Structures are given as structure tokens and as C-alpha cells.
Amino acid sequence: MAYSYTEKKRIRKDFSKLPDVMDVPYLLAIQLDSYREFLQAGATKDQFRDVGLHAAFKSVFPIISYSGNAALEYVGYRLGEPAFDVKECVLRGVTYAVPLRVKVRLIIFDKESSNKAIKDIKEQEVYMGEIPLMTENGTFVINGTERVIVSQLHRSPGVFFDHDRGKTHSSGKLLYSARIIPYRGSWLDFEFDPKDCVFVRIDRRRKLPASVLLRALGYTTEQVLDAFYTTNVFSLKDETLSLELIASRLRGEIAVLDIQDEKGKVIVEAGRRITARHINQIEKAGIKSLDVPLDYVLGRTTAKVIVHPATGEILAECNTELNTEILAKIAKAQVVRIETLYTNDIDCGPFISDTLKIDSTSNQLEALVEIYRMMRPGEPPTKDAAETLFNNLFFSPERYDLSAVGRMKFNRRIGRTEIEGSGVLCKEDIVAVLKTLVDIRNGKGIVDDIDHLGNRRVRCVGEMAENQFRVGLVRVERAVKERLSMAESEGLMPQDLINAKPVAAAVKEFFGSSQLSQFMDQNNPLSEITHKRRVSALGPGGLTRERAGFEVRDVHPTHYGRVCPIETPEGPNIGLINSLAAYARTNQYGFLESPYRVVKDALVTDEIVFLSAIEEADHVIAQASATMNDKKVLIDELVAVRHLNEFTVKAPEDVTLMDVSPKQVVSVAASLIPFLEHDDANRALMGSNMQRQAVPTLRADKPLVGTGMERNVARDSGVCVVARRGGVIDSVDASRIVVRVADDEVETGEAGVDIYNLTKYTRSNQNTCINQRPLVRKGDRVQRSDIMADGPSTDMGELALGQNMRIAFMAWNGFNFEDSICLSERVVQEDRFTTIHIQELTCVARDTKLGPEEITADIPNVGEAALNKLDEAGIVYVGAEVGAGDILVGKVTPKGETQLTPEEKLLRAIFGEKASDVKDTSLRVPTGTKGTVIDVQVFTRDGVERDARALSIEKTQLDEIRKDLNEEFRIVEGATFERLRSALVGHKAEGGAGLKKGQDITDEILDGLEHGQWFKLRMAEDALNEQLEKAQAYIVDRRRLLDDKFEDKKRKLQQGDDLAPGVLKIVKVYLAIRRRIQPGDKMAGRHGNKGVVSVIMPVEDMPHDANGTPVDVVLNPLGVPSRMNVGQILETHLGLAAKGLGEKINRMIEEQRKVADLRKFLHEIYNEIGGRKEELDTFSDQEILDLAKNLRGGVPMATPVFDGAKESEIKAMLKLADLPESGQMQLFDGRTGNKFERPVTVGYMYMLKLNHLVDDKMHARSTGSYSLVTQQPLGGKAQFGGQRFGEMEVWALEAYGAAYTLQEMLTVKSDDVNGRTKMYKNIVDGDHRMEPGMPESFNVLIKEIRSLGIDIDLETE
């Protein structure tokens, strides 16, 4: 196995037993692929596929005018270039988008000619607004904030059969129904009522008999019956009836007469019930007809009209019940043949026939009118209107679309073989659905399971954006149609016809405010990746929280390998928001697929197939952990398998597929929990969710016990810097890495240099800090996709959300009661859980009615001390340490002329002071905040003069850009001259640059020449001269290209910013706030074991072992048994072993042992105790030393989900580290030095600090705002509110009889307006008395009673 740059430096000991058949796929593929399909950027006109934007345009165009004399056709589209790159968009608060230009063709037909001759054609490109672009990490930048569009899991279009589970009717009878759901258009429902008639509803309106719909489709009663029933044929001869016999239909009936064979032998006696045995005998005897008495047909229903053979008079209508009167007429008229419907109570009910009987319509027109009345009640129906409405409902491509998915699901469900077809319904479709529904009612076939993942599909970003875009286009279409009639006469161009505003508005609305367009969760790399892989059942066209029942939220067998059964939020959204499983992907129809290995005759192959939930149903699927021999043959007698969505066991020969990996069941977050298989599901759910809330610590620390997925998450999340091409590190500093690309990876015409600017101390969406640190050194070789710099919460290319803490499970003085956590002061001293939070504070200078606001250091009534951190422009310096109330940006606002007091007039006359007509509206640091200014950005409107600060910021940015471009040029130039040197040395010169003819060129000669003179050399060989010319042209070209790039960036920086109307200037100040861990902060492990820090004890008081090593954290052992998350104990044991081995390696290095000894010990760790073998022999001695140095803090272990370390392996590891195999040790009390009475479990657990910090929650109100109606203080930190003294608290004071305190609480401290104002005044005067008055809430009560019409007044004495 090849190791990457970072893997070589620190190898994880992997305990997995199963080989990797397939790597975990790229985790953001679902987002990126979907949007790439939507845009089809870079495709030429012929390459466009019928998806995304192209499909939306094709579905709306061509637009034809009402008269039909003009048409607007769509030719193609192209996307422009974005005005700013992603970082600039975030900084400036704009949307990262590209302009969309559509080429349309206007065709005007000649009115006079009969065969629509073309009179004029105009083609033009029309601007259709901006389309947001997806960043390479699967996010969108909308108005400067990063957002994610969450995929939606919705009911697939198609046809579904269901029943009401006996809830509708009191008898508990199952009422079956069918529903045709299109991708867009009207829903069509068929349903049975308790009397077994079939009804139809369109768009959930009033129901009509289903036969009305069939008649509207043009079927006659006879055709309907013919489609749904078979017939019994009776021949009538001389008062006797003869039935053409189909033996199987007699089953269950009672014989009216003896049934005899040809020889007269009785097969069934009269009065006996006919059984399957009798039917066999009848068929054997070959009886073709059966004589029955006339009354045998009484009560049966006619299948065809019965006509008098002589006169043509209708004796009985079709679908009429035969009675004695009709029979008498038939016998009299000597009718020869009667056809009746074959129905019975077992498997062929008379449902459609009964429905026809209650149907009041008799022909197509009446049926159409009836449907029109139901859809448009109150409007007078006409024949044309009724026909148009009906045709538009299901048969018009503009109004109705099943989509490819819908057609495929529809055809499969009704048993057709082809999967493609029209997007609209046809007659046959509707009849087929009714037939299937009647079959299900008759007991043939089963209803669908709506929660089966074969009936729910995923709508990704691209598809939702396409739908929104189409909505915009349809709005445009209406306007264009009206203008097209003008275009015929007035010679307009396409540009004059199309108004792109509705399209732009629809797209903007979707990305800005759709329920599924969410503010990205950017706490840490895991939360980013999980957010992008989320699948929600909520949103437009989906479910709502209130209506979603238990079934929809539950785990379904088809979730296996597609949707994670663990990761879902706790609370009202449980089960509605899910996460994709690690290996899942969507197919072309949007159904989730999971990968499997193909198994043939018990031999497991390496062929991998992706199957959707429907496709896998018939397969027999073994688990990934099924036992195989060396030849990959399944060897167990019985294998645990999944078949037909059930878990069962089968023989190896029956197995057809096998899981690719044990972790394919769970999502990315759940697959990061070691020993997940030992945790209770509820706690695992909490563990998955809490990892997403971990705040990136100051120094990331890799987990000692991981699962091996950490590297994938860090790489795919996009927070690390990954090498685009392999090469050598040319230079590296804290803020950028320059790579000289290897020659074999440079394509012609490209620069052989990659420059990576690192993100330094940037604010994330959640105010945490994004900072990248380089891992490479100058001169290192890197390969493509190696990790060169760590981001937040990553350590050497691995996800590192928390810190490894030495913990002990023991009760300790009640400090860890109820999940509290007791910490050692050492944790704070070493800054283990110190986090940096970055706050953005904005100051906006507007143009007001009274004049413009001004940003300045000249602020009225403010002392010098308050201004000493501001520069002359009135903006705080970068690096200043500021606290609550300090001025960050000085700003003054003009205030209206006020009446001056005589004193002020006098002062003005003496000092000529004008400062009083402006008021101080400076940006100050909010309460409870203390930090360092790390950055300032100034945005100025076009036409407003820029201040000195803005100019200095611009100069710094230009210097950075110039430095980058110069560096790039230096490397390109250096590489070119190196290539020339190797080509020229040893060849003869013809002259030039002061050389003699025939002189050999050496390195010394070239070193003596300036670079510019190399090109003056004339060589003896023409090929070399040509190479020199090409090199010179290339270098000049490159220089010009880089200069153009610089000018372009300069132009962008110097142009004014596009600010909101009325805004002159915006100053953004970024504060970095350092937060150490403190009591009240929430911490957690990865197993759902969460708690709040209760106390931070001095190191010397903490329990310590015999060597004097104190523990860092004391946890309560009672938190484990009832919660059943035993994974944390195993993690603690393995963590202890990992740390012990690291210490052992450290001792070997300090004792300067031989490399061979180190190599032997590493071999013991990696290759002798279970799990995967590592190829340490391929490492050089230096690499072994580097590896050992990085292992001194502990040997990282990986115990993959469901394939992790066994108990015996943990014990072997502890033994190798010279630690007790029990994982327990004797501890001593730090305060007394006494032994604790029994050994304690001590080890290393990975702990996270969650983004629920006490600093963000704690606040105290002094004076603040009041609620308008009740005049009581507001609640909550955001409103600077007070603590509610509620009903129960009042009871408590009443119980103590604390009358004065109670009065104070309910009046002056709450809503007695006059009382509290007076009291404030008294306190200022030093008089500490209060006079309670009438609380405002009492007045509110009086007003409410009056609103009920009761006059109530307070009597004053």
C-alpha cells in the first residue's frame, strides 16, 4: 500500500479484519454532481443533455403567439465568468454567481400565405439574470454567507395503491385506494367506499363515481364491462338454458342439478358444494356445457344489450339485473344467447358493475359536464369548456408531467415491461390502474409500502433549482405571449420581448429563502460535511412536522446501506431529517443505491454493483463479515443474510450478493464513533449529533482511538489544503505554500507552479475560527491529493474534534453528581480546551434626512482615553485589545436643531462651539465581550472619498497579489531557464552574446551571462535556436499575462463597492475572543456521554497513580450502566494502551536506542497484534525515526465500526505497553495521599468541548427595554431581558409570608411604570425608598374584561 505524505509521518494501527474492497466514495459527490448536471457548464450546443437548465428551456420554448403568426424558439445558452471569486464574494457580501445568456430565435410567419411561409427570422442573445455557482466544497455564497441546499426525500411520482387500515368505517373494513401522483399536475385518486363502489377524486375534490371518468374518456358501458369482466354465455332452447361451462368458475357454488358425465355417472349430486376435486373430475370428463333451470340466471347482470331478434327492440339494457319479467320477455322473443357478467364473492367482485349502476351520467358529454361542475363549481358548463378542462387535466404536456421516473414507476407497478413512455396519461393507463385496484380488492396483489425507499426518491440541488427556474420561465412565457402579437407588426427584437426579472426573482427566492436553503453549519469540518449529506423529508412538496406520523419517521428495512438508522435530530424532527449512509449514492432516477459485491456459487467476486431498494428485494445478501477462506469462498454451513427485507439464514450457494463494508449501514458521523457496536442506539444518536457541535480547539489533537474514517472526512470536507498536482515545495510560510510542479504533471501552456494561499483566522458561520497551518517544509516532495496544510479541527490530515484526556471513572466528593465533569487545572493551564471565537461587528454610515453620517475620530463629549485606540480616520487599529464599551469605529450622526438653553447659547457665543448638532453613534464593543482586533475592512460607495485607512488596506492587498504573481513568474522563469540549460550545455555556439563561433557552451559561461542575454545566443543547431525563440516568447507571454491579471485585480479593488441604497460607508471590525474552559461549559465524549463542567480543581488535589501522574478528568461511573454505552469504557482501555506505547517509544528515543530496535518494536505494535499489516520494511531509517517521533504522544489506533478491536487484542496491547491487563490501577487521593479502597478504571478518552458555552448563556439585566403592552421587562439574552418571576415563584414568597419582597417584585421591579421611574430617581438622589403604584398588567386585565363587554372600573376612595 502506498502511504501519502501525512500517513507516512503517523500511521494508525488498524484493527480491521476485513479487506477494503472499495474506498469510501467522495463524500460531497451528491451535491457537486447534481449541480454540475444542472448547469452543464462548458458543454457545446450539440453536447447538451436533456437535463437541468437545458431541459427547463426546452419544456417552455417555443412560445407561440395567440394568433400563431410569430414564435420564439430556444437555441442554446452560455454561462459567463463570475465577477468575483469566492473569497471576495464572502468579504463584499455579494452572491457568487455567473450571468446566464440565452440565444433565442424570433420567427415571424407570413399572415397572407396559407402554408405558414416564414417572413422573418431574428436571432439574439438575451441576458436572463444571474445563476449562483456552487463552490468546490458544495456550498453556495448568497449575499456573502455560505449556504447549503439540503436534498429532499419525497414521494416518487407514479401510482400507489394503499388502504385506510380500517380506520374510516366503523366496521373496520379495509377500503382500498389508488393514487396517481405526477411530477407536476393534478393528482388522481380512486377509492372504494364501504358499499364497494369505486369513486374518483381529482385534486382531492368532491368524489364522483369512477365510471364518470371512464365515460369521459369515451368508453361506453359495454366497453367498460368488457374491459373488467369475463362473461358467462347461456344458450336458450325451448325453455331450457345451457351454460357454456368453464369448470373452474363453479368452485364454491352449490350444484343446482346433478352433474353427470357422458355415461351418466354422477360427479356432483344436487345440493352439494362443488370443490376443487369435483372440478378436476369435470375437466377430466370433458363436459363442455351444463343444462341449468331458467331461474339459475335470476339476479345475474347482463354483459351486453339483449335485443329482440325480429323487431330489434331492446329487451334488457347492458348492466341490468335479470328478473322474472325480463326472462319471460326473453323466452317469448326466442332469444338464442344471453351473456351475463361472471362475478363471485371470493375473487371477482361486482364493483365496477355496481358503480355503473349508481352513475347518473349516460354518455361522454354528460360525464365531461359532471367533471367540469366538480372542478369549477358555480360556473356554467359549455361543451368546449368541459372538453378543454378535461384534456388539460391529464393529457396536456404543459399542465401535466409524470416525468421519466413517474412513467418508469407507473409502468412497473401496473406490470408493463417497457419503462419509457409519454409524460402524460392515456386512456389505457387509467383503465390499467383501475384494473389493478380492483384486482387488489379481489385479493390478487398487495398494497404498496409508502415508506419503502423504492417509493421515495431524493431531489438534489440541481433538480430543485431546475424546477424553480422553470417556474420563473413559465411566468415569463405569459408576458412574452402577449408581446409576440406586437412583435408581428412593430418589428421588435427578442430582447424587447423577454423580461428576465421573473426568472432572476424565482432563482433568488429559491437560494435565499427556500426552506431547504440553509445557513451552513460550520462549527467544524464534520458538521459541514454532514450538512451537505443531509436528506430532509420536510420542505416544499414534502411533509410537515405536525402531520408526519410514526411510520414515516421509523427506520425501514430498505434504509440499510442508504440512509443512516442512527443519525437524526432529537426533538420534533426526529426521523424526518436523515443522513446519507457512507457508501450511498443516487441513481439517474433519484433513488438511493447501495453497493454490493457479486457472489456466484458461494464465491465472492470483486465485482461491485449499485442497487436501489427495489432492485435488491429479490437478492439474498450476506453481511460483509461473513466468513470466507483464502479463495474468497463462503465456508459457513448457514450464512446470515437479508432477503425480502427480512433477516434470515441461507446456505452459501443461495447467496447472490454481499455487503462491501461493515460501515456501509451508518453515516459519516456515526462511523467516527469507535466501538459503536457496543453502544445503545439512543446514545449513539446523541454521540453522532454532538460531534457536530464540537468547537475547534486552539491546538488540534488527533484521537488516540479513532475509526480510520478521520482522514476521509478531513480530506473531503475542504478545510485542508490538498495538492492539486505533485511536485516540490519551493517556499512555505504561515500564510502560503508555493509548489514547483513536477515536469510530468505540467501540461503545455500551463504554469508549472501552484500557489496555495492559506486561510488565516477567518470567521466561520458559527463564529468559530477557521485557520490553516502548513504541514510541509521547503524541499519536501508531495504527490497529487496529499494534504499540505491542516485546517480547523484537523491534525496531520485527520479530523481532530477534541482532545485526549486522562480520565478516571470514580465518584469524587459529589463533584460529578448527575453527569457533572470534574476537571484538573492542568487542562486550563495547557490550553487544552481553549477555543478562539471571531465576532464580526459592523458600522454603517448612512445618508440621513438631516445630512450624511460621518466616520471620524472627532466625537463630541468623549475623552482622549476613549480615542487612543483609533487612528486619524476614527477606526480602531489592528492588534488593539478592547473590552466592553470601547469605541471601535467613531461615528457621528447629525441631529435636528433643538431649542438651546440660555447657558448653551452663552457657551456658543463665547467658544463658538458647533459640536452639539451631531450625536455620538459610534460602534462600541458589546457587553460581556473582550478580545483583540484582528482585521478591519472598509467598504466605500462609488463617488464617496476613501479615507486613509481604506487606502492603506487596499495597498496591503495589492502588495500581496503582486508578491504572488512575482513568485509565480520567478518559478516559471527559473524552470524555463533550467530546461534551456540542460538543452544548451555541451552544444556549440555560432556566436552572439560575446561568444566565438564553435565555442562549447558550459555551465560557467551560462552563469556569467544575464538571463536576457541567453536569448542572444546563436546555436549551430536550428532546433536549439528555435527552442530559444520559443522560450523567449513564452516568458514574455507569461509576464504579460501576469501583468494583466494584476491590473484586473487592481481594477476590482479600486472600484467602489456596491452598497445598499442610502449607505455611504461600511466598516467591518473582526474581534478574536479567546475562551478557556470554565465551570458551566458543556463537554461530551463520542458515545453520547455529555455533561457540564462542575469544578476545576488544582492539579495537586486530583487523584494520581503510584507514579504520581494525576488524572485530568473525573467522570461518574454511574453514567455508564443505565445508558448502556459501554463503548466509552473500551475506548478508555485502548486509549490507555495507545498512550502507554507512545511513552515506551519516547523512552527508547530518549535512551538513543538503535533504529533496528525501534523498527522491531513498531513491527510488534503494527503487525503482531490482530488487524491490518503495515509495510514498515519499505520505510527508510530516517522515515522510521520521523514516524517514531510523531508517535511519542501515543500510537493512534483505528477500530472501525462493526469490525473493531476485540477484547483479547486490547489486552494484548495493554500487555505490550507494560500496563495491567484489567485497565484498572490503584489511585491515591491528592489531598490526603490515602489510597482509594479499590482499583479504578483509568485511561484516555477523547473529549469534545461543545458549542454551548456558559459565556454565551449567562447574562444579567441592569436596565433595559420593556414589553409594549404589559410594560414588563423582556426575556432572553438577545433582548437584554430579565429573569421571569413566575406564578410558582410568587407562591414561594407567599408561603414564606414575605409580603414586602413580594410587593416589590410585582410592582417596581416589574410593571409599575411610575413607581420604577420614581425609584430610579430616588436611588440617584441617595434616597432608598420606594412607593409602589398600580401594576400595568392590572390595566391590561381590565381592558381584556371590557373587551368581553363587561364594564369594570376601579373605585378610588
Swiss-Prot record:
The keyword Transferase applies. Its EC number is 2.7.7.6. InterPro entries: DNA-dir_RNA_pol_bsu_ext_1_sf (IPR042107), DNA-dir_RNA_pol_bsu_external_1 (IPR019462), DNA-dir_RNA_pol_su2 (IPR015712), DNA-dir_RNAP_su2_dom (IPR007120), DNA-dir_RNAP_su2_hyb_sf (IPR037033), RNA_pol_bsu_bac (IPR010243), RNA_pol_bsu_CS (IPR007121), RNA_pol_bsu_protrusion (IPR007644). GO terms for molecular function: DNA binding; DNA-directed RNA polymerase activity; ribonucleoside binding. It catalyses: RNA(n) + a ribonucleoside 5'-triphosphate = RNA(n+1) + diphosphate. GO terms for cellular component: DNA-directed RNA polymerase complex. One of its GO terms (biological process) is DNA-templated transcription. Keywords: DNA-directed RNA polymerase, Nucleotidyltransferase, Transcription, Transferase. Transmembrane segments: none annotated. The RNAP catalytic core consists of 2 alpha, 1 beta, 1 beta' and 1 omega subunit. When a sigma factor is associated with the core the holoenzyme is formed, which can initiate transcription. NCBIfam families: PRK00405.1 (NF001616), rpoB (TIGR02013). DNA-dependent RNA polymerase catalyzes the transcription of DNA into RNA using the four ribonucleoside triphosphates as substrates. Belongs to the RNA polymerase beta chain family. This is DNA-directed RNA polymerase subunit beta. It comes from Pseudomonas fluorescens (strain SBW25). The lineage of its organism: Bacteria, Pseudomonadati, Pseudomonadota, Gammaproteobacteria, Pseudomonadales.
